[in-house]
Amino acid sequence: MSSVTQPLAVPRPGVASLLRDYSELTKARVTTLIVMTAWTGAFFGAAKSGLPLVSWTLFHALLGIGLVSGGTAAMNEVIERESDARMRRTAIRPLVTGSMSLGHGMVVSLVMMIGGAGYLGLMTNWLTAALALMTSVVYLMAYTPLKKIHPICTTIGAFPGAMPPVLGWTAIRGHLGWEAVALFAILFFWQFPHFHSIAWLYRDDYANAGIRMLPVVERDGRSTAREIVIYAAFLLPITLTPFLLRFAGRIYFLAALVLGSMLFWVSLRMFTMNLAPSSPHSKKYARQLLLASVTYLPLLFAVMMLDRTI
């Protein structure tokens, strides 16, 4: 009696690499963070309306926002593919390596952006869809080209960067509110310590690509450090507005004071230390600030949401 051994099913070659390419194209990690901050806005929108904190509307909102965000990131990589090829940290992107064609990237981008906006309009409301598209337009048509022209690009980019919680809020509420403005302001001011620390760490890469971030234009580091301290100082009182608007309580108030003071202290250290490019401390303090900023924001929002539920 003979038996035939059936071959094991194996994944189709190229599927895993294609998924990795899509992840790189849509900046999956950044898109995930955007969805999480949008969730914060949706959370407080639901709490304000007396709606369930978990609902199908929330699902539709986060999915639509994620699609628009991922599509915008993909179009950014389409536009900046030549600059990306000149930077070590972005040279692995699929449009640079050739593992994905330019046409493929453009189609994915447009389908996600337009489809995501349409999905938001149909499943939540058209205000959110319009704001999402406006955010994409400002990011792609103002921030992206300005990166090659003037350091003000960081300020312009902070506007679309602060929109996710506003989108989450309007998706649930259907209109704007002071709570959404407060969340927008927190995210707006937080971006300066965060992105200036990144720009300082990768200033040589940016210089090679012709991207005129502040650390590239002002090589001594004083202007960068000064701007970091100023925005960190403004951020501290701004984070207290949720308490003043009474959508967060005393636990949040104390946490905002502690977290804000710690971020300001790290920012101040970067200002007081020697940040000359040749200094051995140059990247050390920028890296510490980057770590502090990426720890600060999720902790702040988590405490804000937790305080609302207890």
UniProtKB/Swiss-Prot annotation:
GO terms for biological process: heme O biosynthetic process. One of its GO terms (molecular function) is protoheme IX farnesyltransferase activity. Keywords: Cell inner membrane, Cell membrane, Heme biosynthesis, Membrane, Transferase, Transmembrane, Transmembrane helix. InterPro entries: Protohaem_IX_farnesylTrfase, UbiA_prenyltransferase, UbiA_sf. Gene3D superfamilies: UbiA prenyltransferase. It is found in: Cell inner membrane. Pfam families: UbiA. GO terms for cellular component: plasma membrane. Belongs to the UbiA prenyltransferase family. Protoheme IX farnesyltransferase subfamily. Carbon 2 of the heme B porphyrin ring is defined according to the Fischer nomenclature. This is Protoheme IX farnesyltransferase. It comes from Koribacter versatilis (strain Ellin345).
